[in-house]
């Protein structure tokens, strides 16, 4: 029987935690990080009015009205009459030309 050290690691054992993927920022002893990355705080009035910046309006007048019935199915478009009238018949041969061909061929 194989020893416990030789077996493959379980999937649960292999799974990495989320903290493994975070980029580690090097810390320097002589630099205060609070002064480098400090951002001026907004005024208290701005914090109360817009906690997360932009937001979706939730008032009833801003909502899209619900449809009570389904819309009708799309209908097939009709072919315009102009398109049908423009179509010419295909002429394969003209009868007078055929008669002349046979007359000339018979004379030779």
Swiss-Prot record:
Keyword Cell cycle among record annotations: yes
The keyword Cell cycle is assigned to this record: yes
InterPro entries per UniProt: SMR
GO molecular function, one term: protein kinase inhibitor activity
GO biological process, one term: regulation of DNA endoreduplication
Keywords, alphabetical: Cell cycle, Protein kinase inhibitor
Source species, domain of life: Eukaryota
Biological role stated in the UniProt entry: Probable cyclin-dependent protein kinase (CDK) inhibitor that functions as a repressor of mitosis in the endoreduplication cell cycle.
Protein name: Cyclin-dependent protein kinase inhibitor SMR13
The species this protein was found in: Arabidopsis thaliana
């Amino acid at each position: 029987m194989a020893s416990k050290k030789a077996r493959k690691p379980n999937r649960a054992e292999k799974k990495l935690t989320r903290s493994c993927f975070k980029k580690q920022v090097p810390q320097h002893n002589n630099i205060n990080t609070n002064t480098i990355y400090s951002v001026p705080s907004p005024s208290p009035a701005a914090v109360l009015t817009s906690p997360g910046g932009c937001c979706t309006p939730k008032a009833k007048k801003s909502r899209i009205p619900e449809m009570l019935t389904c819309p009708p199915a799309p209908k097939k478009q009709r072919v315009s009459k102009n398109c049908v009238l423009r179509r010419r018949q295909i002429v394969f041969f003209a009868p007078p030309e055929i008669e002349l061909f046979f007359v000339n061929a018979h004379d030779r």
